[in-house]
Amino acid sequence: MKDTAKKPILVIMAAGMGSRFGGLKQIEAVGPAGEAILDYSLFDAHRAGFETVVFIIKHAIEDAFKSTVGARAEKAGLNVRYAYQELDILPEGFTVPEGRIKPWGTAHAISVSYTHLTLPTILRV
């Protein structure tokens, strides 16, 4: 594994369930060779000097995500890490309100990725 301690880390929030889109837009093929939109972002990030990417995903999409976007990112030479945004992963003292099913949002996503981060870090929303 490469020494990436001083290199910037790219964090990509990809835990959305695509309810408005009607599917998992994170892995939806849009390019001529089946590329997802994220593949284009990863290509540009790698060319800009990023060597590590942290994908924030849900366990529910883990297999599909890892076998598509994640696998292509690794094949391109990126050091890939995963953080999981789930409703029950909360700071001490917090609880999930009854009936809540939606993700908590950006601050929660960043909090679950914190253990993977060193400075500098770039967040792609």
Question: What function would you assign to each model-found segment?
Answer:
Residues 86-107:
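Active-site-proximal specificity loops/subdomain of glycosyltransferases
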Residues 77-83:
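A contiguous, low-structure linker/loop signature
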Residues 83-85, 112:
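Conserved beta-strand termini and adjacent loop/short-helix elements that scaffold enzyme active sites
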Residues 115-121:
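Conserved small/polar residues in nucleotide/adenosyl-binding loops
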Residues 107-114:
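Short, conserved alpha-helix that lines the donor NDP-sugar binding/gating region
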